[in-house]
Amino acid sequence: MTHSEYRDEYCGAVTESLIEQTISVVGWVHRRRDHGGVIFLDMRDRAGILQVVVDPDTPEAFATADAVRPEYVLKITGRVRRRYEGTENANMTSGHIELLAKEIEVLAKSETPPFPLNDEKSTVSEDLRLKYRYLDMRRPQMQDRMVFRAKATSAIRRYLDDHGFLDVETPILTRATPEGARDYLVPSRTRPGNFFALPQSPQLFKQLLMVAGFDRYYQIAKCFRDEDLRADRQPEFTQVDIETSFLNEEEIMNINEGLIKHVFKTMMDVEFEKFPRMTYAEAMRDYASDKPDLRIPLKLIDVADLMKDVDFKVFAGPANDPKGRVAALRIPGGASLSRKQIDAYTKFVGIYGARGLAYIKVNDASNINNGVDKESGLQSPIIKNMTDDVLVSLIERTGAESNDIIFFGADKASVVNDAIGALRQKIGLDLEMTTCEWAPLWVTDFPMFEETEDGRWTSMHHPFTKPKGSVEELKTNPESALSIAYDMVLNGTEVGGGSLRINTLEMQTAVFEALGIDDQEAEDKFGFLLDALKFGAPPHGGLAFGLDRLIMLMVGASSIRDVIAFPKTKTAECPLTQAPAEVNTKQLRELGIRVREKVQADTSKPAE
């Protein structure tokens, strides 16, 4: 029991073991019901809900119960008893018992909340929920998610502690480094015109901890990125940050795979087999994504070689373009899709840059070896542009059967991958094609660099990732270089990513050169790291998990905002505190900052 001045046990933890005992509980009134002279109060705390019965035999308690309203804070003392037969609630831990009240004390009254807290089905705008987040988090679903997160985080710590990792804190105020997103800057009062940056990750500091000899490090770290927000993005987020020395790629992956297995087993009693692995090239070829959802048994099939000579520029153009791709996606049973559904999918792929969505309905594939019946066997506006040989080859290569549909993507490879990869995921979920609840995997062997639109190289992960091969090989063929990097994917979501790191000055300099970072820029931005590499840096590597994203998947939430206590909106604002906000002139003057007025566009005249 949980003894204190106020209570003996949590409401949700009162069970049959306490029958006939007198106890005190505290909490909020979840519901109040008056049934023919007997008042029922559902009392709620973080552990759950307890039914309290108040009858007229205790007139003082009855009068108090008659006056209370939802969200009043009460202390109730009474006797635990078994519920009458037929009134049990198997969905509640306390569903077989109730508390017969003797005394009720009002600890705090409540105004009527701006939205109901006892109806999970009520539709409430997210902005209103975030404005009154302290009320929103009283809802049982939010309480459960916050408790789940806390326990999962504890399980993570226990696993890492048991495996010899040390929890070491790294600075929040650091310097700006290019890691792919804009930094949040903090002005220095003591050095006017200079700024700290909030860390996008503890990357460099954890590498320095390896140089310092702390060979197994972890941290539940706050990270900050000033970027456009999506369902799985926040300006501040939490990362399970891990780094090790003297372990190879396989050993690091095994430790982190074990961590996820431990958390799922501890929290959900879910057991995983060994995670499958595929290379980045295989993932892009078969799933058009570097984070494929393997619950969905659909694969893309390359058909560019069949389309090089067709009388259809939409296909022939990309088929003959070295940077193009023509891919087919077969949907079993998809011939039943309506014109309206196909139009909706066409609109969907347009979001990703596709200029249309070609398809062939396979109504009858029974006589495919005897040629193609274009009248009844296949149905599509595009088949008139293809020979029978091409159509037969398409059906055979995709394995299409009667009543299937084949969708096509034909464009630059990047557009096809984005559009058809997303279509694969959407159709798989829309048509309920998932074959299992959880599908983890590792994706490995990422390209070291990717080319920008202006022809420069940029790091696919970050510039401290160790490449495969030698310095000479990197300098000779940077476009072919692969990194010793690995991402953990779960149900189509990247939950973690890591790599081996560069631990020699020679290789780090070569990578900077490939990225167009000259010696002076490297010294200015990363001089402290380059210096550290001169003093015996051990072979090291690590990984970071997005804690918010992992918890979101585990509890089935639709957004990480639903598993963060006080999240920001999609516009990086906090409706609760009204942050960000203006500060007074005195504070700005102390920091040597002057705010420029935004120039308002003249909207009185039409644009020319």
Curated annotation (Swiss-Prot):
Identify the GO cellular component terms for this protein.
Answer: cytoplasm
Q: Which residues bind L-aspartate?
A: 179, 225, 461, 501
Give the first-level EC class, as a single word. ligase
Q: Where is this site: Important for tRNA non-discrimination?
A: 35, 86
Q: Which InterPro entries match?
A: Aa-tRNA-synt_II, aa-tRNA-synth_II, aa-tRNA-synth_II/BPL/LPL, Asp-tRNA-ligase_1, Asp-tRNA-ligase_1_N, Asp/Asn-tRNA-synth_IIb, AspRS_core, GAD-like_sf
SUPFAM superfamilies found in the cross-reference section: Class II aaRS and biotin synthetases, GAD domain-like, Nucleic acid-binding proteins
Q: Enumerate the catalysed reactions.
A: tRNA(Asx) + L-aspartate + ATP = L-aspartyl-tRNA(Asx) + AMP + diphosphate
Region feature (Aspartate)? 203-206
Q: Where in the cell is it found?
A: Cytoplasm
* Function text: Aspartyl-tRNA synthetase with relaxed tRNA specificity since it is able to aspartylate not only its cognate tRNA(Asp) but also tRNA(Asn). Reaction proceeds in two steps: L-aspartate is first activated by ATP to form Asp-AMP and then transferred to the acceptor end of tRNA(Asp/Asn).
What protein family is recorded?
Belongs to the class-II aminoacyl-tRNA synthetase family. Type 1 subfamily.
Task: Write the protein's name.
Answer: Aspartate--tRNA(Asp/Asn) ligase
Question: What species was this sequence derived from?
Answer: Psychrobacter arcticus (strain DSM 17307 / VKM B-2377 / 273-4)
Q: Which gene encodes it?
A: aspS
